[in-house]
UniProtKB/Swiss-Prot annotation:
One of its GO terms (cellular component) is cytosolic large ribosomal subunit. Residues 232-257 are annotated as: Disordered. PROSITE patterns: RIBOSOMAL_L3. Keywords: Ribonucleoprotein, Ribosomal protein, RNA-binding, rRNA-binding. One of its GO terms (biological process) is translation. Part of the 50S ribosomal subunit. Forms a cluster with proteins L14 and L19. One of the primary rRNA binding proteins, it binds directly near the 3'-end of the 23S rRNA, where it nucleates assembly of the 50S subunit. GO terms for molecular function: rRNA binding; structural constituent of ribosome. Gene3D superfamilies: 3.30.160.810, Ribosomal protein L3, domain 3, Translation factors. This is Large ribosomal subunit protein uL3. Belongs to the universal ribosomal protein uL3 family. Transmembrane segments: none annotated. The gene is rplC.
């Protein structure tokens, strides 16, 4: 399977309308051109892959190993280095844009990291049931309960691996399959992808060819929005007060008295 992919940054979500008045939720991904920083082959590395670098930064912001890596290959320094397996056919140093890899309506798989929620209990992490809140239930209303496998006899006197317990929740790699490309914004370097993508705003996103719907393209036509220019009204003429030097005779009489 010919694999094509590009890395970007999640900006946020919005919505867009088609010609059939269908409202599509979309995720906006900022995708600047990815640079081919390395090529791996079966003959040398036992597998095919393409190493991509993205998000341009000043060379001083990189550590010494990355500075040496880019200076040795005489490439533009980037903050991130990521590898995509089974991606072939690109020359070293080439800049890849999303318009070169995908078409509007093409199905893609999007990989990203979910939001990190820190150390949480079993109720939030695994959707366990809350304990009874009354009738002498005592203090542990939100505890996970017993974790042992059994009591004596032939039952195992240990806790099995993979037992659902309290622990670190979130910050896991998730792939959303069978989304499709809605559109491109070449000026602002944006890619519009249908549906929701896991992770926070500013998280790294990988857009790759769909594994299940390979080569399939969805027929999509967006509604063209026409905006009428506002009609400017002529400003109203302000009435100017004419100052006169005439003196009121009553005021002068009061002053003389």
């Amino acid at each position: 399977m010919d694999v094509r992919g590009i890395f970007g940054v999640k900006v946020g979500m919005s919505q867009i309308f088609t010609e059939q008045n269908e409202c599509l939720p979309i995720t906006i991904v900022y995708c600047e051109a990815n640079q081919v920083a390395g090529i791996k082959t079966i003959a040398k590395d036992n597998y095919n892959a393409t190493l991509l670098s993205f998000q341009t930064v000043d060379e001083k912001q990189l550590n010494k190993p990355k500075q040496g890596f880019f200076s040795k290959l005489k490439l533009e320094p980037h903050k991130y280095l990521r590898e995509i397996r089974k991606m072939q056919g690109f020359e070293l140093g080439k800049k890849i844009t999303p318009q070169e890899l995908f078409k509007i309506g093409e199905y893609v798989d999007v990989t990203s990291l979910t939001k990190g929620r820190g150390f949480t209990g079993a109720i939030k992490r695994w959707n366990f049931k809350i304990g009874p809140l009354g009738h002498g239930a005592g203090y542990p209303h939100r505890f996970q309960g017993s974790v042992q496998a059994g009591r004596g006899g032939s039952s195992a006197q240990r806790v099995f691996k993979g037992k659902k317990m309290s622990g670190h929740y979130g910050h896991e790699q998730v792939t959303i399959q069978n989304l499709f490309i809605v559109g491109f914004d070449e000026i602002n370097k944006l890619v519009l992808v249908s549906g929701a993508i896991a992770g926070p705003e500013g998280g790294i996103v990988l857009i790759k060819t769909a594994k299940k719907k390979t080569g399939k393209i969805k027929d999509i036509k967006l509604a063209v929005q026409t905006v009428k220019a506002p009609q400017l009204k002529a400003p109203k003429k302000q009435k100017t007060k004419v100052e006169t030097n005439q003196v009121n005779p009553k005021i002068e009489e009061e002053k003389t008295k």
